A protein has these predicted regions:
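Chalcogenol-based redox active-site neighborhoods
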Residues: 1-161
Length: 161
């Protein structure tokens, strides 16, 4: 169940409402972003489960989980991988947060994270590693594009109130 909600044309800016969506989680449940109003949300987009950079990014967040909980933050990771693959990834690395499947990349498009990439001279569409910190009212408080997995957790903590 991938419902990106109203289309925003890929325009997202700090201070504006975060595009709402409903995606399927690693446990098979439908998760809607707006259901977390009242708490800050760390919404991070990543290319693929169980790859070096994505694993470092996820484990970095896991390693500061206690601090994120103290700040009352909800963490949602989003990639094009399916719920089963997410469940295996989450279990393998003991990730305490929810992973969401955006298999048709509609939500990534609404957040402008589904972008043109290139590798070895080939051009293709793929997920840009990006994070959005959404405040308790549902507005985008901070946008981090092309994040570095090694520094990501510290940057997320610094962006939270």
């Amino acid at each position: 169940m991938n419902d990106p909600g109203p289309r925003t044309g890929g325009v997202v800016e700090e201070g504006r409402p975060a595009p709402d969506f409903t995606l399927t989680s690693d446990s098979g449940e439908a998760v809607t972003l707006s259901s977390f109003r009242g708490a800050p949300v760390v919404l991070y987009f990543y290319p693929r489960d169980d790859t070096p950079g994505c694993t470092a990014q996820a484990c970095g967040i896991r390693d500061v989980w206690g601090e994120l909980e103290r700040k009352g933050a909800v963490v949602l990771g989003v990639s094009p991988d399916g719920p089963r693959k997410h469940a295996k990834f989450r279990e393998k690395y003991g990730l305490p947060f929810t992973l969401l499947s955006d298999e048709d990349h509609a939500v990534a498009e609404s957040y402008a994270t589904w972008v043109q990439k290139s590798m070895y001279g080939k051009s293709y569409m793929g997920m840009e590693r990006s994070t959005f910190v959404i405040d308790a009212e549902g507005n985008i408080a901070s946008i981090m594009r092309k994040v570095k997995p090694a520094d990501h957790a510290d940057d997320v903590l610094a962006a939270l109130p």
